[in-house]
Amino acid sequence: MSTETLERKSVQRKPMPLYKVLLHNDDHTPMNYVIEVLMKTIPKMQPSKARKIMLEAHNGGVAVVIVCALEHAEFYSESLNRHNLTSTYEPDC
């Protein structure tokens, strides 16, 4: 009886592309509400980080909330939109 060794082909997986979830400023939503929604929507979002994102969007017009896989970016952006915040997502180049 002979023993034959099969070679396993090396498969290199490409890393999944990442997407930025963006929060756009609006002048009507209370700042505390934006902070609250960010903390409820994004896992492990700390109040200080949520406040920083809110202020960046308020002062600069837009802020990056999180960079993640497409499926998560879609979910987070849609969740922010459901809470009457303006959010989009785009590839992270």
Curated annotation (Swiss-Prot):
It comes from the Bacteria. This is ATP-dependent Clp protease adapter protein ClpS. Involved in the modulation of the specificity of the ClpAP-mediated ATP-dependent protein degradation. The gene is clpS. Belongs to the ClpS family. Binds to the N-terminal domain of the chaperone ClpA. It comes from Gloeobacter violaceus (strain ATCC 29082 / PCC 7421). Pfam families: ClpS (PF02617). NCBIfam families: PRK00033.1-4. GO terms for biological process: protein catabolic process; proteolysis. InterPro entries: ClpS, ClpS_core, Ribosomal_bL12_C/ClpS-like.
